[in-house]
Curated annotation (Swiss-Prot):
InterPro entries per UniProt: YaaA
Organism phylogeny: Bacteria, Pseudomonadati, Pseudomonadota, Betaproteobacteria, Neisseriales
Protein name as catalogued: UPF0246 protein NGK_0633
Pfam families according to UniProt: H2O2_YaaD
UniProt superkingdom: Bacteria
Family statement drawn from the similarity comment of this UniProt entry: Belongs to the UPF0246 family.
Gene Ontology biological-process entries: response to hydroperoxide
Length: 259
């Protein structure tokens, strides 16, 4: 069983990584192709392409200029400790033990606009390139056309090498669109997290993102290899709802918190 997650825009570049183990991204040669094109963009072009402020555009122009291989622990950081958004706050990898971190490495993959597909302990240098960005490139008009079936093929190889036949999709729609589900050789399960608000259950983005990270943490802390055991996920008040679920979409609900 493998999980796939989206990356995060917010990055933690400063805090030291709590583990020394690292791996290299499998698709770094593809990343270098993209980065060569990204480096050609002036800050103003980055601002327009990515719909960001001038300050963020300048930061990322500087990141692009500084980006270089080979990656080492001195100039890069393990991805699961670099990403710093809601999903990763829910996972809170910094407080997992060595065996649990190894579980992440063995069972979790991170989608990325620049790096394609990463292991949690793959080294990465800071960047900003969301998968949905309309970044025209040598292979097409956007990143979905750039990556084509490359990410799907690597996922299939990863699943086959591990003898696994289940992929748990905890990524956003924007990122999971980079996976060709018609060619994916695995059973696909998509957990959906709903919170009660004013008597109705709905997906609330912030809570849903955090819950995705919490589910990965739950799996790591319980060393889960059987997908059915994920139905016992109960962190922060969530519970599996069988009636609202089907074979491929598993719904977890949480009652409104009384403050």
């Amino acid at each position: 069983m493998f999980f796939v997650l989206s990356p995060a825009k917010n990055l933690n570049e400063k805090d030291p990584c709590p583990v020394s183990e690292f791996t290299q991204p499998d698709l770094l040669a593809e990343s270098e192709i993209l980065m060569r094109q990204l480096r050609e963009l002036a800050p103003q072009q980055i601002a327009e392409l990515m719909h960001v402020s001038d300050k963020i555009a300048l930061l990322n122009a500087e990141r692009n200029a500084a980006w270089h291989t080979p990656f080492t622990p001195e100039n890069a950081k393990q991805a699961v400790f670099m990403f710093n958004g809601d999903v990763y706050e829910g996972m809170d990898a910094n407080t997992l033990n060595t065996n649990q971190i190894q579980y992440l490495q063995n069972h979790v993959r991170l989608l990325s606009g620049l790096y394609g597909l990463m292991r949690p302990l793959d080294l990465m240098q800071p960047y900003r390139l969301e998968m949905g960005t309309a970044f025209a490139n040598l292979r097409g008009k956007n990143l979905y056309e750039f990556w084509g079936d490359i990410i799907t093929n690597l996922l299939n190889d990863t699943l086959a090498q591990a003898g696994s036949n289940t992929l748990v999709n905890l990524a956003s729609q924007e990122y999971f669109k980079s996976v060709n589900t018609k060619k994916l050789r695995a059973r696909l399960i998509t957990p959906i997290f709903k919170d009660e608000k004013n008597g109705k259950y709905k997906i609330i983005s912030f809570y849903a993102k955090r819950a995705r990270g919490l589910m990965v943490r739950y799996a790591a802390e319980h060393n889960i290899t059987d997908p059915e055991m994920l139905k016992n996920f109960n962190y922060e008040g969530y519970a599996f709802n069988d009636a609202a679920s089907n074979e491929s979409e598993w719904v977890f609900m949480r009652s409104e918190q009384i403050k």
